[in-house]
Regions:
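AMP-binding/adenylate-forming catalytic core of the ANL superfamily
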Residues: 1-86, 100
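Conserved C-terminal "lid"/linker of ANL adenylate-forming enzymes
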Residues: 19, 69, 73-128
């Protein structure tokens, strides 16, 4: 069994990740729902010359997806004490932050059951 909390805590060390929830503990591979740090991500797009029409367009941009893929690989690695089964090969970038009273408790803990329900289609798409 894989404990998601240490993985999520490590991923939040990235300047580009604001919120994250690991999914797929019952699947062959893990996945992640990631809420980017949009301020840092927009700084990155200015520096690299990425053009986009909307926030959703930004999140689908191949360069942005590669940035997050690289972040996941470097953070969840054996050099950081993670096992290969804890690597996250698939993820979805979300355009909306998790909110207190909805996806988060008053103490900012993730409500996994709520997020799984709200983002069920995103999660399912990672395993098709």
């Amino acid at each position: 069994n894989i404990e998601p909390l240490p993985i999520e805590q490590k991923l939040k060390e990235s300047i580009f990740i604001n919120q994250v929830m690991v999914v797929g503990q019952d699947k062959k591979t893990l996945g992640a729902l990631i809420v980017p740090d949009f301020e840092k991500l927009e700084d990155y797009t200015r520096e690299t010359g990425i053009e986009y029409a909307s926030r959703d367009g930004l999140l689908e941009h191949p360069t942005v997806k590669n940035l997050y893929r690289t972040e996941l690989k470097s953070l969840i690695s054996p050099k950081n004490g993670f096992r290969t089964v804890e690597y996250i090969p698939t993820f979805r970038l979300l355009s909306k932050e998790f909110e207190i009273g909805m996806e988060l408790t008053q103490t900012l803990k993730i409500r996994r059951n709520v997020i799984t329900e709200v983002y069920g289609e995103h999660i399912a798409s990672m395993y098709r």
